[in-house]
Amino acid sequence: MKKIIIGIDISKEKIDASAIDVRNSQLGVLKLDYQVFENRPMGFRRMLVWAKHLIKGVTLEEVMFCCETTGGYDRCLCDYLFAKGLDIWRESSLQIKKSCGLRKGKDDKADSLTIAEYAMRHMDKAVYYVSPSETVRELKALLLYRRKLEQEKTSKKVRVAELKATAAKSKSVSFILRDAQKSIRALEKSIKECEKQILAL
C-alpha cells in the first residue's frame, strides 16, 4: 500500500508535481505540496530531493508517482524513476479524463492534483512502468524512421505525378522531375537499408 502519491503533469519543458498523503484518505486527502521542475535530468533530481523532504517517516519505495501518457514527453522521467527503483504509473490521459470529468481550460497545477487523486482512487489498478529493453527501443526508432521515409517518398511521387499532369514542358520542369526521381531512388535505398537494420536486431 502506497502512502504518498505524487501526480505529475508533464509538458515538453516542465513537470508540475502535486503530492498528497493518502494514509488517512477516509478523513480526506491531505495535500502536501506542489512544485514545478524542468523536464530534464536535473529537474528529475530536484523533484526527488523535494519528495524526500516531504515524506518524513516514509521511504521513497512507499511513494507512487503517476503521470499521463504524453506522446513521449514523459518517457525520460519514467526511465529515470524506473532506473532508481521507484514506481511510476503511466495512465492514459483519456482514462483520467473519463474518470474525473472534463477539465475546463489548461491548469497544470490543478491537473497534477487531479492525476494524484485519480491514482489514489484507482491504486488497485496501477500498472507500473517497466523500461523497455534497448532492442525494443532501437526497433521503435527504426520503424518510426522507416515510416517517415515512406511518407517522404509518397509525397515526392505525388509531386512528380502532379507536375507530369499539369506543368508545361520546360528546362526547369525537366530538372525538377529528374531531381525528384533521384531523391525517390535515394529514399528507396534508405528504406531498404533501414529494413536491413530492423532484420538485424
Features from the language model and the residues they span:
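Short, basic/hydrophobic alpha-helical segments
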Residues: 41-64
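Short glycine-rich, Thr/Ser-proximal phosphate-binding strand/loop in the N-terminal lobe
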Residues: 12-42
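Gly/Thr-rich phosphate-binding beta-strand-loop-beta motif of the actin/hexokinase/Hsp70
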Residues: 1-23, 115, 149
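Long, charge-rich intrinsically disordered scaffolds of nucleic-acid metabolism proteins
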Residues: 82, 89-201
